[in-house]
């Protein structure tokens, strides 16, 4: 495979925080990407669950162009009608009453964490600052978010960890109950389906149980649906699978903008009671350009056509991947996840396997627990899914041959 990406550019002036593949793209359409070398790839990464409707979706392109000719940015010191419209739509389709708009998922998580602590302060309990996440979680790269995740890879070397952040282990019910019952606990934060942690889907009864425990002890439940929300599980929001397990606060982003930078922190009126004037803010959050695209993306994603397609195609994927697992037990250990957030746990190194898939012109993402993730556009067709399976089959054959060599 060619490692060339451009004859006129280099990474010399780019901070070296990314382990990039030797590959660059110049255009895309739907689930297809065309490299700078002119080669076509089937994209089952979708910007890590961000290009929810694929690349250059005509409806989003049209809305973006129309809004770009009118107004890009004004300050939040003024009313922004496009922001109000998207907030209305999000609240009408979720548990939430109010929304704060950001530019990314990690900013939405930061807002959620601040909202939770401010709630208890407004209730006359400022000592309630402790926030518990779970092992294997990923909540973003800003400082509170990495402390909520607790992954040493993301927090080591940056000085003292923030006080008030700890992690729990799924299945350790005694520790979970004790944490929630503590008089200094402010909130629990959880991904209903973990993404970076290896596509681990939290059982619905666990989410319902968390909500019940939180309500008993006055603790707020925060869901991070930055990756698993916006239709990826076959419902608009992943929490909808757990009746009675809805959150008090939720962070969303990624597919909400269809690839355009956007994020949102959703909350009930009660949970957001402490977020009064000047409690939080954002320069670019809620700008008219992002809001116009977000509203258009939401309308398409929440449609029965899109959500039914996710259920149909993800069911096909799961069936076919389990077939590959049966045929290649020396390569595939497990198939897991929910909807189009699919994890495949491997025996060979997942990064090596990603290269084998890329050799077949298939793009897949890495994940924790030696998984690779399939995160295709929500409108992927059965034919495209079948093509992806055929490419994965060839990658499995190559992995087997490599191990035998």
Curated annotation (Swiss-Prot):
It is found in: Cytoplasm. GO terms for molecular function: identical protein binding; N2-acetyl-L-ornithine:2-oxoglutarate 5-aminotransferase activity; pyridoxal phosphate binding. Binds 1 pyridoxal phosphate per subunit. Belongs to the class-III pyridoxal-phosphate-dependent aminotransferase family. ArgD subfamily. It comes from the Bacteria. Pyridoxal 5'-phosphate binds at residues 105-106, 138, 224-227, 283. One of its GO terms (biological process) is L-arginine biosynthetic process. Its cofactor is pyridoxal 5'-phosphate. Homodimer. It catalyses: N(2)-acetyl-L-ornithine + 2-oxoglutarate = N-acetyl-L-glutamate 5-semialdehyde + L-glutamate. CDD domains: OAT_like. InterPro entries: AcOrn/SuccOrn_fam, Aminotrans_3, Aminotrans_3_PPA_site, Class-III_PLP-dep_AT, PyrdxlP-dep_Trfase, PyrdxlP-dep_Trfase_major, PyrdxlP-dep_Trfase_small. The gene is argD2. This is Acetylornithine aminotransferase 2. One of its GO terms (cellular component) is cytoplasm. May also have succinyldiaminopimelate aminotransferase activity, thus carrying out the corresponding step in lysine biosynthesis. It comes from Caulobacter vibrioides (strain ATCC 19089 / CIP 103742 / CB 15). Pathway: Amino-acid biosynthesis; L-arginine biosynthesis; N(2)-acetyl-L-ornithine from L-glutamate: step 4/4. The keyword RNA-binding does not apply.
């Amino acid at each position: 495979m060619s490692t060339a990406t451009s004859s006129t550019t280099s990474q010399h002036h780019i901070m070296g925080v990314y382990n990039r593949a030797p590959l660059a793209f110049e255009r895309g359409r739907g689930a297809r990407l065309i490299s700078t070398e002119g080669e076509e790839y089937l994209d089952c990464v979708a910007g890590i669950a961000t290009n929810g409707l694929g690349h250059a979706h005509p409806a989003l392109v049209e809305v973006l162009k129309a809004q770009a000719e009118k107004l890009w940015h004004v300050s939040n010191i003024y009313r922004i009608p496009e922001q109000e419209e998207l907030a209305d739509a999000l609240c009408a389709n979720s548990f939430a009453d109010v929304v704060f708009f950001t530019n990314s998922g990690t900013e939405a998580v930061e807002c959620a964490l601040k909202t939770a602590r401010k709630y208890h302060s407004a209730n006359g309990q400022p000592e309630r600052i402790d926030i518990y996440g779970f092992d294997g979680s990923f909540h973003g790269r800003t400082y509170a978010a990495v402390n909520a995740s607790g992954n040493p890879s993301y927090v080591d070397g940056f000085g003292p960890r923030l006080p008030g952040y700890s992690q729990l282990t799924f299945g350790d019910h005694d520790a979970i109950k004790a944490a929630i019952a503590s008089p200094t606990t402010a909130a629990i934060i959880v991904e209903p389906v973990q993404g970076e942690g290896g596509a681990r889907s939290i059982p619905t009864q666990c989410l319902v149980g968390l909500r019940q425990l939180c309500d008993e002890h006055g603790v707020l439940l925060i869901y991070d649906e930055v990756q698993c929300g916006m239709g990826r599980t076959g419902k608009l929001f992943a929490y909808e699978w757990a009746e009675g397990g809805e959150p008090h606060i939720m962070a969303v982003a990624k597919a909400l903008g269809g690839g355009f930078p956007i994020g949102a922190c959703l909350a009930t009126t009660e949970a957001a009671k402490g977020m009064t004037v000047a409690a939080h803010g954002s320069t670019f959050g809620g700008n008219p350009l992002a809001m116009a695209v977000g509203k258009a993306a939401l309308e398409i994603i929440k449609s029965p056509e899109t959500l039914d397609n996710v259920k149909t195609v993800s069911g096909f994927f799961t069936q076919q991947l389990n077939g590959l697992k049966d045929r290649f037990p020396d390569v595939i250990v497990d198939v897991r996840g929910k909807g189009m957030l699919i994890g495949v746990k491997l025996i060979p190194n997942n990064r090596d396997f990603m290269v084998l898939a890329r050799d077949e012109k298939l793009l897949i993402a890495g994940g924790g627990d030696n998984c690779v993730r399939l995160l295709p556009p929500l409108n992927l067709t059965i034919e495209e899914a079948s093509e992806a399976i055929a490419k994965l089959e060839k990658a499995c054959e190559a992995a087997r041959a490599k191990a035998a060599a």
